[in-house]
């Protein structure tokens, strides 16, 4: 491992931003392969108390987009991906599992637990534009879906703004119901 190496620290977006940067480096030709991902372990007294202080923690389970949701649950975990230029992967006989077509990054510094619809919409619109695909080509969204009323409602409104009538055809879920909110490792 001798290519670009750096750490990204942007809260819940850290691993997504790290993967976007790895994708951009491969796409630019700076490196044919990048290893990227994210991890987080905040299941300690201070970490739990900090989120409890924000009053966003569930008493029992994380249920993103459910009428019975009552907050998030912390988790810990990690994920690592290999981003590789397609011809380079084929030349070495690698099994290509998926393709990343595009990405976007935005900033939404208004509130840590009350995201803005505009910020989420800009990110989705930018990703569609960068990928060069129409919104009707999207069939599934793995949403941030924290299980808090504020986040879930805002995300749904942003999806409706970006995808219009196609939003009714989309499958949307959040894996946080299975592993909790992994903070910086969430995207990986």
List each model region and its residues:
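Short glycine/threonine-rich loop-to-helix capping motif typified by GTGT followed
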Residues: 109-120, 146-163, 182-188
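Acidic, glycine-rich active-site loops and adjacent beta-strand->loop/helix elements
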Residues: 10-14, 38-43, 102-107, 145-147, ...
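Condensing-enzyme catalytic core mediating Claisen C-C bond formation in acyl metabolism
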Residues: 57, 61-133, 137-140
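Conserved small-residue
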Residues: 15, 22, 51, 82, ...
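A glycine- and small-aliphatic-rich helix-loop capping segment at beta-alpha/alpha-beta transitions
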Residues: 25-28, 48-59, 118-122, 154-166
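Short pre-catalytic strand/loop immediately N-terminal to key active-site residues, enriched for Gly-Thr
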Residues: 3-11, 66-70, 170-182
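Active-site-proximal alpha-helical scaffold in enzymes
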Residues: 5-37, 74-94, 181-188
């Amino acid at each position: 491992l001798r290519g670009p190496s750096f750490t990204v620290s942007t809260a819940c977006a850290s691993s997504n931003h790290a993967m976007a940067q790895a994708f951009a480096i491969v796409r630019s030709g700076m490196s044919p392969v990048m290893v990227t991902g994210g991890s987080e372990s905040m299941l300690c007294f201070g970490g739990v108390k900090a989120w409890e202080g924000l009053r966003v923690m569930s008493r029992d389970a994380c249920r993103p987009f459910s009428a019975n949701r009552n907050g998030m649950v912390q988790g810990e975990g990690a994920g690592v991906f290999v981003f590789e230029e397609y011809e380079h992967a084929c030349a070495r006989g690698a099994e290509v599992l998926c393709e990343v077509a595009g990405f976007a990054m935005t900033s939404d510094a208004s509130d840590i637990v009350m995201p803005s619809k505009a910020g989420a919409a800009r990110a989705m619109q930018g990703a569609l534009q960068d990928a060069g695909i129409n919104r009707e080509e999207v069939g599934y969204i793995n949403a941030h879906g924290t299980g808090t009323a504020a986040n879930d409602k805002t995300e749904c409104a942003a999806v409706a703004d970006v995808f219009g009538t196609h939003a009714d055809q989309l499958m949307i879920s959040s894996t946080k119901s299975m592993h909790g909110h992994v903070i910086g490792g969430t995207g990986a």
